[in-house]
């Protein structure tokens, strides 16, 4: 299901994948998701690495994951007091501790063909 995240009247984004640990009833998301995942392509790489990185950081998205299929690389960033910090690069597995007792364990082993 595609879902828009309406940040404000002028800014609406549609990440490749979002994980949301809170309920919502509108046709679009009006609060930051817990995790945003963007899959890079040549046409989106700059925007995903720079513009969306800054936007998601400003909007307090706890985890931002960038998947780069050209280099078989997964980058996981976690929000801290002073911005995003890298916490893992191409892990086999990673556990995300989120709000509302929401914990997600992800097995990244099958993301890329071996």
Positions of PLM-derived features:
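C-terminal interaction segment
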Residues: 1-59, 66-114
